[in-house]
Amino acid sequence: MSLNQLKAPRGANRAKKRVGRGQGSGLGKTAGRGGKGQKARSGNMHFEGFEGGQMPLQRRLPKFGFHNIFRRELEEVKVGDLQGLSGVVDPAALKSAGLVRGNRDGVVVLAGGELSSALTVKVHRVTAGARATIEKAGGKVELIPAPQTMHQKAKAAKKAAAQAK
């Protein structure tokens, strides 16, 4: 077999849709655009949410809320998910166990499920119910400081540069 003998499999290349070429094609006269109206014209500009000139819903409703750029997004782990682990449980151990991805601003342990083994849990945040469950099983909870956000790192670098002068 050589390059000049290569051929696309049957049905791989669809024929170009030829519109407006007679009734027999099924796409004659209006070319599949239906009757008259804005959508039948060329360059039919209308944006998503356009209501024919009526004030659209997204503009009729008032704005509310905001997105806090300093918000910390924590990865959640339930106490019951820690059941298979042993010894010291920290974010690195949780990542290797596949319980967290490790791409957020820290880890929070939530109540939910049972725990039978004593664990030392080192996380960024823990709920009261989760702490009670861990300590009831004979374990202990240690809070570790949250990793710095990009904003905090930039601020610290700026402060260090100012003090170095």
Curated annotation (Swiss-Prot):
Q: Which domain of life is it from?
A: Bacteria
| InterPro entries reported for this sequence | Ribosomal_uL15 (IPR030878), Ribosomal_uL15/eL18 (IPR021131), Ribosomal_uL15/eL18_sf (IPR036227), Ribosomal_uL15_bac-type (IPR005749)
Where do Gly residues bias regions lie? 21-37
Q: Where is this region: Disordered?
A: 1-44
Question: What NCBIfam families does the entry give?
Answer: rplO_bact (TIGR01071)
State the family it belongs to. Answer: Belongs to the universal ribosomal protein uL15 family.
Q: How does it assemble?
A: Part of the 50S ribosomal subunit.
Put simply, this protein is called: Large ribosomal subunit protein uL15
Q: Which gene encodes it?
A: rplO
